Design a protein with these regions (language model features):
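Extracytoplasmic gating/loop element in the C-terminal half of outer-membrane beta-barrel translocons
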Residues: 81-177, 183, 209-233
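Transmembrane beta-barrel domains of outer membrane proteins
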Residues: 4, 67-69, 171-173, 250-252
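Secretory-pathway/luminal and periplasmic proteins that interact with or process carbohydrate-rich
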Residues: 22-25, 89-97, 191-198
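Gram-negative outer-membrane beta-barrel transporters
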Residues: 1-75, 81-90
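Flexible, surface-exposed loop regions and adjacent strand-edge segments
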Residues: 29-40, 97-105, 199-209
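C-terminal beta-signal and terminal closure region of outer-membrane beta-barrel proteins
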Residues: 196-253
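Residues that define the transmembrane beta-barrel architecture of outer-membrane proteins
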Residues: 58-62, 162-166, 241-245
Length: 253
């Protein structure tokens, strides 16, 4: 969906919404077959192609644009342009797999976890006595896991939280002489984070392999859980959550 309008005074406004429900049988970027096998999340047989959520794209995405130019000077040959872009989106699909090879397919990375009920946790064999309670608490604070107790996690069925970001651009164009002009620009990416360090932050999964598993000679699993794992999401501290500024200078002739 998209709506846009240019007003008589030169103001341009645009707003749009995209919805995506994409599925595939393999979302892994792999140059060799072994990686495609080892990293593609599965329930049982990695050689069996199963249609499931694709990891790519945002499920919901709202965008908005506002731009305005002012012409002035002799013969209105100088132009100042100010524009902004805003995005609000929910995407970042991910899944939960065991830290271990529970299905004996040779990969410790691709086995989707079973989300146990409270009573089932009490019947599981854990490596330490506190693991059961810590796993119970972790499941209960996670909306996706809590909603799928007694079922397996879906391939890329979980979504990261909503994120919002605004970019701002300033352009000053100066005409120097016939067919010659100088343009100076400033881009501020994630402008909200410049105004407030708590704005424009992106959250990411804290751990996508929350449950460890080892199989003994008799085929019985022993589970483990990291006691330091309290919450599903943490803030991404890289540049994606930080404001950035860049300058541009262009001479046209």
């Amino acid at each position: 969906l998209k709506a846009q309008k240019t007003f008589d005074n030169g103001l341009y406004l645009m707003a749009a919404y995209n919805f995506l429900d994409s599925k595939d049988v393999n979302s892994i970027e792999a140059e060799i077959t072994g990686d495609a096998f080892a990293f593609n999340p599965v329930l049982s047989n990695a050689n069996s192609a199963t249609l499931a959520h694709s990891k790519y794209g945002d499920r919901h995405r709202f965008i908005a644009v506002a731009a305005k130019s002012w012409n002035y000077g002799a013969n209105k040959e100088w132009t100042t342009t100010l524009s902004s872009f805003y995005e609000l989106a929910q995407g970042g699909r991910f899944n939960y797999t065991y830290a271990g090879d529970i299905n004996n397919d040779g990969s410790n990375l691709n086995d989707l976890i079973y989300i146990p009920t409270t009573s089932e946790i009490g019947q599981m064999d854990f490596s330490t006595a506190t693991d059961a309670g810590n796993l119970e608490n972790f499941i209960n604070q996670d909306d996706y896991l809590k909603g799928r107790r007694g079922q397996y996690a879906e391939r890329y069925g979980a979504l990261t939280p909503w994120r919002g970001k605004m970019d701002v651009k300033f352009i000053q164009n100066l005409k120097i002489k016939d067919n010659n002009s100088l343009e100076f620009s400033i881009d501020i990416l994630n402008f909200g984070n410049l105004l407030n360090s708590d704005w424009g932050l992106v959250q990411q999964p804290n751990a996508v392999q929350p449950i460890g598993v080892s199989i003994d000679a008799g085929g019985s699993p022993t589970y483990s859980f990291n006691s330091n794992l309290k919450e599903t999401f943490v803030y991404n501290s890289t540049l994606i959550s930080r404001w950035q500024m860049q300058f541009g200078l262009r001479y046209s002739f």
